[in-house]
């Protein structure tokens, strides 16, 4: 293969790596769940991982049920899902 062809291949592979989203295998599956306040009426500040933005965001948790994508601190959320 010519050096031009190798450069093109290298460029395409680099572009693929940049544009390909992080695989959900990099964190637990529950990190892909949407924020869920649950049916209770409490007003608790909690954090959830937002897979599209690939960051942890705050939401209001009602205090019961919901799902596993629910953390008391942003640090706990980041350690679990955004690492």
From Swiss-Prot:
Every BPTI/Kunitz inhibitor domain range: 31-81
Reactive bond for trypsin, annotated site positions: 41-42
Listed name of the protein: Kunitz-type serine protease inhibitor carinatin-2
Keywords on record: Disulfide bond, Protease inhibitor, Secreted, Serine protease inhibitor, Signal
Cysteine pairs bridged by disulfides in the record: 31-81, 40-64, 56-77
Cellular component terms (Gene Ontology): extracellular space
Tissues where this protein is expressed: Expressed by the venom gland.
Annotated InterPro entries: Kunitz_BPTI, Kunitz_BPTI_sf, Prtase_inh_Kunz-CS, TFPI/VKTCI-like
UniProt record similarity statement: Belongs to the venom Kunitz-type family.
Signal sequence residues: 1-24
Function according to Swiss-Prot or TrEMBL: Serine protease inhibitor.
GO molecular function, one term: serine-type endopeptidase inhibitor activity
UniProt cross-references to Gene3D superfamilies, sorted A to Z: Pancreatic trypsin inhibitor Kunitz domain (4.10.410.10)
Cellular localization per UniProt: Secreted
Main localization, broad class: secreted
